[in-house]
From Swiss-Prot:
UniProt family annotation: Belongs to the UvrC family.
InterPro entries: GIY-YIG_endonuc, GIY-YIG_endonuc_sf, GIY-YIG_UvrC_Cho, Hlx-hairpin-Hlx_DNA-bd_motif, RuvA_2-like, UVR_dom, UVR_dom_sf, UvrABC_protein_C
Oligomeric and partner information: Interacts with UvrB in an incision complex.
GO molecular function: DNA binding; excinuclease ABC activity
Gene Ontology CC annotation, any one: cytoplasm
Span of domain GIY-YIG: 16-94
Main location per the UniProt record: cytoplasm
Annotated function: The UvrABC repair system catalyzes the recognition and processing of DNA lesions. UvrC both incises the 5' and 3' sides of the lesion. The N-terminal half is responsible for the 3' incision and the C-terminal half is responsible for the 5' incision.
Domain UVR: 203-238
GO biological process: nucleotide-excision repair; SOS response
HAMAP family: UvrC
Name under which the protein is recorded: UvrABC system protein C
Species the sequence originates in: Bordetella avium (strain 197N)
CDD domains, per the entry: GIY-YIG_UvrC_Cho
Gene behind this protein: uvrC
């Protein structure tokens, strides 16, 4: 280690306090972040003669500096550790993708509540059910509630402005509260039953509906009895189609780990209100060679730092850190217990989660092998490095220009890395200051903006740069690279073939190599076509959104007397410009701040 850092002295001065430690390499990069109840004991353990694994030994051999942060408690250390892992993404930590928040099913607090798919903070008023493992599970549940309880799903602005019921009412999926086709008390009762159903009281709800049906029939209220009979029939079908288990009403997450072929899968299954909502596989980075229990623990620590901790966790492996669940419970303000040898239905859940983990891993390995084979084919065709590490690190960027008659010109850049597209790295560039429709000038501008950052050391240089175009576009790209002092050998144009058919493209090079036609059967060309088509799709969607936004906003802005606040009220009331356009003069005048005279001007301007 360098003279300026004295390891022996550093370890001697460490306190017996909780905190977070960081291992740094010669370049000052953080290689690993960990937490400790006792910093002195934990950090010192890394420098003993025997270490837990060869991977840890390899990391320790590269450590040239240590940093620690003392915290007030181990729970605080856990929070800091997770924040640092997410922001720094150290290469020796097991990393799980920072997934977007899980979806919920929301029953709103409206006078006539609606059921809705919801993602975000749960601090707003309403009843939240979930979280669900994916959007499909939420939407399936909404369909069940529509069939059984006929609750509305329309936006409040649409609900407030309906004069006749929609198609969902006609097909028996909504009771029509927008036109008072159902009594307020009956609708409220249906909402309560739906909430109880979601909380796992399906059998009790069924019994209640049956009792009310018998009562209505006995009192000769046959129409009401028929509605309740149909509701009971729909609920009965749901109960036969789905497994509803009575497990004391405790929400449960089931976690199973499978490993093979150098990859690991952590499968998370969710059970809410006795209903198995499905599962979701996670594939961590930097987990090769790690014990399954360590991977599971890393998942739990990272996942439940940001997501709801359920009362019960059913796990395929015991946790090495016995204090972890206590820390997460303290952070969440709720108690949680871990079961590693479950019985009864929970055992079947774990067995199913384990099978699904193994199946997801097998699919991922098959897909990964196929993707790697395509990358290898491309590298061989273009004479690039073909060793495994180089192929995994091969970064391909593709640029495309999109506009309509010169309006809303945008350039797109999509990125292929680790044998797959990387949407989080995509970028759009608004093109300005050029003659409308000049694609060459647009390409020059986007390439200059992107690759000037490479020469400044602010961005990585791709191994391959694809240009959607032929000789003209490639020549523009070559000029930009020469001006910036970059290797023109990385530039490849994708010239469209006859009839723009996939498989007939020709590759055009900037370094005087002869054009290359790989042919329809080439896996390399299929990969190039995929990246090129993704760049085109990304550019088109961005251009359309930009053009639509400009046109929609400008139409209202051009109307005298419609300022920002009135425009906002109109769009909110009618759910967008199309709603404003279809509104009558009387409807427009009902909006706060819109007089009858102004409503007529708005109507005339939009028609």
């Amino acid at each position: 280690m360098p003279d300026e850092f004295n390891l022996k002295s550093f370890l001697a001065d460490l306190p017996h306090l909780p905190g977070v430690y960081r291992h740094l390499d010669a370049a000052g990069e953080v290689m690993y972040v960990g937490k400790a109840r006792d910093l002195k004991k934990r950090v010192s353990s890394y420098f003993q003669k025997t270490l837990a694994s060869p991977r840890i030994a390899q990391m320790v051999s590269k450590v040239v500096r240590l940093e620690v942060t003392v915290t007030r408690s181990e729970a605080e250390a856990l929070i800091l550790e997770n924040n640092l892992i997410k922001s720094l993404r150290p290469r020796y930590n097991i990393l799980f993708r920072d997934d977007k928040s899980y979806p919920y099913l929301l029953i709103t607090a409206h006078e006539w509540p609606r059921i809705a798919y919801y993602r975000g903070s749960t601090s707003k008023r309403g009843q939240y059910f979930g979280p669900y493992p994916n959007s499909w599970a939420v939407r399936e549940t909404i369909q069940i509630l529509q069939k059984v309880f006929r609750l509305r799903t329309c936006e409040d602005t649409v609900f407030a402005n309906r004069s006749r019921p929609c198609l969902l009412y006609q097909i028996g999926r909504c009771s029509g509260p927008c036109v008072q086709a159902i009594d307020a008390e009956d609708y409220r009762r249906d909402v309560q039953r739906a909430a109880r159903f979601l909380n796992g009281e399906a059998r009790e709800v069924m019994d209640e509906i049956e009792a009310r049906m018998q009562q209505a029939s006995g009192e000769l209220r046959f129409e009401e009895a028929a509605v309740l009979r149909d509701q009971m029939g729909s609920l009965s079908k749901v109960l036969h189609q789905q497994t509803m288990e009575n497990v004391g009403g405790e929400d449960t997450d089931v976690i199973a780990v499978a490993s093979a072929g150098g990859k690991v899968c952590v499968n998370l299954a969710m059970v809410r209100g006795g209903r198995h909502l499905g599962d979701k596989p996670f594939f961590p980075s930097h987990a090769d060679g790690e014990e399954a229990a360590q991977v599971q623990e890393a998942f739990i620590a990272q996942h439940y730092a940001d997501n709801v901790l359920p009362p019960v966790l059913v796990c395929s492996h015991a946790l090495p850190d016995v204090d972890l669940i206590g820390l997460l419970s303290e952070q969440a303000g709720t108690r949680c217990r871990v079961l590693t040898r479950p019985q009864g239905v929970r055992r079947s859940w774990l067995e199913q989660a384990q099978k699904n983990a193994e199946m997801a891993l097998a699919r991922a390995l098959t897909e990964s092998g196929a993707r790697a084979a395509r990358t290898l084919s491309l590298a061989e065709a273009l004479d690039l490095d073909t060793d495994e590490a180089a192929l995994d690190a091969l970064r391909i960027e593709c640029f495309d220009i999109s506009h309509t008659a010169g309006e809303a010109t945008q350039a797109s850049c999509v990125v292929f890395l680790h044998h797959d597209m990387q949407p989080s790295l995509y970028r759009r560039y608004n093109i300005v200051g050029i003659t409308p429709g000049d694609d060459y000038a647009a390409m020059r501008q986007v390439l200059t903006r992107r690759f000037a950052k490479v020469t400044d050391g602010e961005a990585p240089m791709p191994g391959l740069v694809l240009i959607d175009g032929g000789k003209g576009q490639v020549e523009v790209a070559r000029q930009v690279f020469v001006e910036l002092g970059l290797d023109i050998g990385a530039l490849v144009g994708v010239a469209k073939g006859e009839g723009r058919k996939v498989g007939l493209e020709t590759l055009v090079f900037a370094d005087a190599r002869a054009p290359l036609a790989l042919g329809k059967a080439s896996a390399a060309l299929m990969l190039i076509a995929q990246v090129r088509d993704e760049a085109h799709r990304f550019a088109i969607t961005g251009m359309r959104a930009k053009r639509a936004k400009t046109r929609n906003v400008s139409r209202l802005e051009e109307i005298e007397g419609v300022g920002a606040k009135r425009r906002q009220r109109l769009l909110a009331r009618f759910g967008g410009l199309s709603g404003v356009t279809s509104a009558s003069i009387e409807d427009l005048a009902s909006v706060d701040g819109i007089s009858m005279d102004l409503a007529e001007r708005i109507y005339d301007a939009l028609h």
